[in-house]
């Protein structure tokens, strides 16, 4: 039965970034609890990925489950056009409470990429409403903002997953990505490329969009907080809105509730997702200011031209509200600090390994960057055989575990990574 189902999956189901001819092997998960994935064959894996940054409290958290159960008995979904409900109202009150005071208007949607689409449409409508032809977005190389169309246009056109669509995407502007590391020395030369481009194109740039502090899929790099401060200063100088993509970093992952807090700045538009529901169900939000919302609302259209079918889904809103209540108990601060300490203690020594180019740690993120591209199938199989779930990509082996992970489990993940580095055939040389 298990083999038949896996064969069906292999032949018919298209997984993320996977070939249908030679797909990376999938494992069959039966259930998940805490930091453990239980497979149908009885094997248990320690999860080091928190399902792509999302399940920050672990799987099957009783409070999140209860929030979903209580809501599903009332209504699982209702359209959001002309209708509202308490789960959405309660969640949005919380979002306004935990974000900067200037972010007062919230557009709910169903995935991180869509929240970026909405942010881009929001800004385009803003300038159109003011009668200005500003349609270009400025960002930095090695950026990643999602896989939908407008989101792809602000991802690095040469070093992202989206170079195949280059001829079809809107053409935006990319400054050099910052080189000064998060905890390194600041060099004001780091901002020169960005400064030149924003000065040159200030009359056509609609907005700047960045991942604050952490460039995720673009290489898992952590850049200096002063870079973001300088970007904010230049945006203010030229009256250009700043969009910050906190989809991966929001809700405590970097040691701050939002990564932009490391730089003590505030965006004009904020995109959040992934961990917003504790990884239970998909949801995202795009937050903006009174100024931007009022300009759009007073325009000829009178509204933001977007409306997803599952916008404001009550189940997702209920889970997100409970997730924020859990976070507001502030255990996450101690948990993330403990993870960071453990990663620095046990992951940093891998810097001396001959296969390792660099090791980076920030909050509950640990990254081993190798010299060579990784054979993902072989290394992934090795991880599963050794009872851990880690999903490498390109030259990177990284950990973004649930905040509840214990030191012993985290050490186990690191130890398996350390051993995997010794297998020459895991690397494409």
From Swiss-Prot:
One of its GO terms (cellular component) is cytoplasm. This is Adenosylmethionine-8-amino-7-oxononanoate aminotransferase. GO terms for biological process: biotin biosynthetic process. The keyword Ribosomal protein does not apply. Its EC number is 2.6.1.62. Coiled coil: none annotated. Keywords: Aminotransferase, Biotin biosynthesis, Cytoplasm, Pyridoxal phosphate, S-adenosyl-L-methionine, Transferase. Substrate binds at residues 52, 144, 274, 307, 391. Catalyzes the transfer of the alpha-amino group from S-adenosyl-L-methionine (SAM) to 7-keto-8-aminopelargonic acid (KAPA) to form 7,8-diaminopelargonic acid (DAPA). It is the only aminotransferase known to utilize SAM as an amino donor. It catalyses: (8S)-8-amino-7-oxononanoate + S-adenosyl-L-methionine = S-adenosyl-4-methylsulfanyl-2-oxobutanoate + (7R,8S)-7,8-diammoniononanoate.
